Amino acid sequence: MFNSIVMVKQVPDTANISGKVMKDDGTVNRTKLPAIFNHEDRVALELALQVKEKYGGKVTAVTMGPPRASDVLRECLYMGANETYLVSDRKFAGADTLATSYVLSEVIKKIGNYDFIFAGRQAIDGDTAQVGPQTAEKLGIPQITYTEEILNVEKN
């Protein structure tokens, strides 16, 4: 049995951005756009669920965001996750990747009891591809990036 934690993110659906959603400073007003499950994180969740199906264990999804990010966590439960955690505080608004990875690493430490941590390659809103690697660094664990398939897993 293997326990997995999956970091997921709710992102704005940027498929149809118009001038109506732009702020005066040129940034996107996220409240004016529908929110969606970040595609790369959905792929990470699907991979974790494949490990669960093949070897047993549990899948926990965690996200940092506003209260409406619970929609993504609900979707994780529908897909097969066993439990979810939403970390939300107005102070987190606009957090950079270092702050985000710090918060997520602290949450993961509190959850504990994991064999794997999955993260999508990058979020479509920031496009940095830094939160997964930075979280691994803060946890002091090795990372493997750009994984598309897990063929076999053994303890130790």
List PLM regions with ranges.
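N-terminal glycine-rich FAD/FM-binding segment characteristic of electron-transfer flavoproteins
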Residues: M1-N156
